[in-house]
């Protein structure tokens, strides 16, 4: 999947659900709080410096950005960069637009095959992170959490963050969530967890290929 993601390019930007492209390829959504490192993670995963852009004013970007991956003539999937959330200075109208846009997209988009949820490893599972899970979990599709910026933690702090997040996800399973809920440590700066994330994304987009390679998938 590393080579597949490295063939990523900008496809389109939409600001309303009615403008979502009528594509047939599977989609993988990337979501996370403002300043959780979402754009940086997408760029590192795709081995590009400026594919995804972070807004100069965190939380102000309210668009959905699509990136196609695979051969340009026959893309095999789309990466979907969702607006960042949780920034205190965002006006109320923008917050309402964000909530409608994301909740409806996550709950109803048939092409969506999984959600990559970025959480700052220093403060995982905020209220808004949980809201994202609760919007998407009823679909039964998988959610994989990247605990970003783990290079800022000590080894023990990283272990604690992973355990705390896993425990929080286990609580959703206990409540009857059927989709897979997995988590890993990730650092764009140190490239920690890059291969693990690539393998998991490939298992979503091309499960038969992943099975043949017997790629490990995060638990």
From Swiss-Prot:
<feature type="domain" description="EngB-type G">
    <location>
        <begin position="24"/>
        <end position="207"/>
    </location>
</feature>
<keyword id="KW-0132">Cell division</keyword>
<feature type="binding site">
    <location>
        <begin position="186"/>
        <end position="188"/>
    </location>
    <ligand>
        <name>GTP</name>
    </ligand>
</feature>
<comment type="similarity">
    <text>Belongs to the TRAFAC class TrmE-Era-EngA-EngB-Septin-like GTPase superfamily. EngB GTPase family.</text>
</comment>
<dbReference type="GO" id="GO:0000917">
    <property type="term" value="P:division septum assembly"/>
</dbReference>
<feature type="binding site">
    <location>
        <position position="39"/>
    </location>
    <ligand>
        <name>Mg(2+)</name>
    </ligand>
</feature>
<dbReference type="GO" id="GO:0046872">
    <property type="term" value="F:metal ion binding"/>
</dbReference>
<dbReference type="InterPro" id="IPR027417">
    <property type="entry name" value="P-loop_NTPase"/>
</dbReference>
<comment type="function">
    <text>Necessary for normal cell division and for the maintenance of normal septation.</text>
</comment>
<keyword id="KW-0131">Cell cycle</keyword>
<keyword id="KW-0479">Metal-binding</keyword>
<dbReference type="GO" id="GO:0005829">
    <property type="term" value="C:cytosol"/>
</dbReference>
<dbReference type="Pfam" id="PF01926">
    <property type="entry name" value="MMR_HSR1"/>
</dbReference>
<protein>
    <recommendedName>
        <fullName>Probable GTP-binding protein EngB</fullName>
    </recommendedName>
</protein>
<feature type="binding site">
    <location>
        <position position="61"/>
    </location>
    <ligand>
        <name>Mg(2+)</name>
    </ligand>
</feature>
<feature type="binding site">
    <location>
        <begin position="59"/>
        <end position="63"/>
    </location>
    <ligand>
        <name>GTP</name>
    </ligand>
</feature>
<dbReference type="InterPro" id="IPR019987">
    <property type="entry name" value="GTP-bd_ribosome_bio_YsxC"/>
</dbReference>
<keyword id="KW-0717">Septation</keyword>
<dbReference type="InterPro" id="IPR030393">
    <property type="entry name" value="G_ENGB_dom"/>
</dbReference>
<dbReference type="InterPro" id="IPR006073">
    <property type="entry name" value="GTP-bd"/>
</dbReference>
<keyword id="KW-0547">Nucleotide-binding</keyword>
<feature type="binding site">
    <location>
        <begin position="32"/>
        <end position="39"/>
    </location>
    <ligand>
        <name>GTP</name>
    </ligand>
</feature>
<feature type="binding site">
    <location>
        <begin position="148"/>
        <end position="151"/>
    </location>
    <ligand>
        <name>GTP</name>
    </ligand>
</feature>
<feature type="binding site">
    <location>
        <begin position="81"/>
        <end position="84"/>
    </location>
    <ligand>
        <name>GTP</name>
    </ligand>
</feature>
<keyword id="KW-0342">GTP-binding</keyword>
<keyword id="KW-0460">Magnesium</keyword>
<dbReference type="GO" id="GO:0005525">
    <property type="term" value="F:GTP binding"/>
</dbReference>
């Amino acid at each position: 999947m590393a080579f597949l993601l490295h063939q990523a390019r900008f496809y389109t930007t939409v600001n309303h659900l009615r403008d979502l492209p009528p594509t047939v390829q599977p989609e993988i959504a990337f979501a996370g709080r403002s300043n959780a490192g979402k754009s940086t993670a997408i760029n590192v995963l795709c081995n590009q410096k400026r594919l995804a852009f972070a807004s100069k004013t965190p939380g102000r970007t309210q668009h959905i950005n699509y990136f196609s991956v695979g051969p340009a003539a026959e893309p095999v999937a789309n990466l979907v960069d969702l607006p960042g959330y949780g920034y205190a200075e965002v006006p109320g109208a923008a917050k309402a637009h964000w909530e409608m846009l994301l909740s409806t997209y996550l709950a109803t988009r048939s092409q969506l095959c999984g959600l990559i949820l970025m959480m700052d490893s220093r403060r995982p599972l905020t209220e808004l992170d949980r809201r994202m899970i609760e919007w998407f979990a009823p679909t039964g599709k998988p959610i994989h959490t990247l605990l970003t910026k783990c290079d800022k933690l000590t080894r023990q702090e990283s272990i604690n963050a992973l355990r705390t997040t896993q425990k929080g996800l286990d609580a959703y399973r206990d409540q009857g969530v059927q989709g897979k809920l997995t988590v890993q440590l990730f650092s764009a700066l140190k490239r920690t967890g890059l291969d693990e994330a690539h393998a998991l994304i490939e298992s979503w987009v091309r499960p038969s290929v992943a099975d043949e390679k017997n790629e490990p998938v995060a638990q």
